[in-house]
Amino acid sequence: MVRYLGPHVKVIRKLGSLRAFTKKKIKRYFKLDTKKRKLSFNKKTSKYKIRLKEKQKLRFNFAISEKQLFNYVKKAIKLKGSSGENLLVALEMRLDNIVYRLGLAPTIISSRQLINHGHIYVDGKVVNIPSFKCKPTNNIKIKDNLVSKRIIEKNIELLDKYFRAPSHLYFNKKKLEAKVINMVKREDIKLIINELLIIEFYSRKV
């Protein structure tokens, strides 16, 4: 994805909280102009806009391009089971998201930088592809050098109160080692989103 360089607050003001995209928060307020308020209540949000918003939430949260998301949707539809759940699982099992969910980086963009710079090993080999698909039994380690360990340890210290490894992941903080225990389950995906609306958004294009 071409990295989004615009104001992050503007994005979450439109789409809502996206913790993997930014830790920034917004203060919500209501305008006192009653006429404008009445007009806003009378406006009906189209089904297209609702689906578009859900799609954008997913795209920004996982920091992927429109083309990448479309490809994930096409693959998800071909698999057995719920297409929406297949889509979320595929994105959740990306290496950049796994590194983020372990609390090794504050956002997915940050975890992607760690991966690109060779700080992350999978099954004993350096993996510098953020979209690498993790699977059960994969062992994830931090590169055994002082620079890598300092970066990760600093992130863990800052993020420890915000992150707990989900049930499909195991993380040993002392050894800086993690393991993928099983595929992520829908209930372990923290992003508040209606994935079926995203499948509907792309249904005519697939």
Curated annotation (Swiss-Prot):
Subcellular localization, per the record?
Answer: Plastid
Positions in coiled-coil regions: none
Give the domain of life: Eukaryota
- Pinpoint the S4 RNA-binding domain residues: 93-161
Q: Which PROSITE patterns match?
A: RIBOSOMAL_S4, S4
Q: Which Pfam families match?
A: Ribosomal_S4, S4
Keyword field: Plastid, Ribonucleoprotein, Ribosomal protein, RNA-binding, rRNA-binding
Give an example GO cellular component term for this record.
plastid
- GO molecular-function annotation terms? rRNA binding; structural constituent of ribosome
One Gene Ontology term from the biological process aspect of the record: ribosomal small subunit biogenesis
SUPFAM superfamilies for this protein: Alpha-L RNA-binding motif
Sorted alphabetically, which InterPro entries does this protein's record hold? Ribosomal_uS4, Ribosomal_uS4_bac-type, Ribosomal_uS4_CS, Ribosomal_uS4_N, S4_RNA-bd, S4_RNA-bd_sf
Query: Aminoacyl-tRNA synthetase: present as a keyword of the record?
Result: no
Q: What this chain does, per the record?
A: One of the primary rRNA binding proteins, it binds directly to 16S rRNA where it nucleates assembly of the body of the 30S subunit. With S5 and S12 plays an important role in translational accuracy.
Q: Quaternary structure per UniProt?
A: Part of the 30S ribosomal subunit. Contacts protein S5. The interaction surface between S4 and S5 is involved in control of translational fidelity.
PANTHER family per UniProt: 30S 40S RIBOSOMAL PROTEIN (PTHR11831), SMALL RIBOSOMAL SUBUNIT PROTEIN US4M (PTHR11831:SF4)
Regarding protein family, the annotation reads: Belongs to the universal ribosomal protein uS4 family.
- What is the designated name of this protein? Small ribosomal subunit protein uS4c
Organism of derivation:
Euglena longa (Euglenophycean alga)
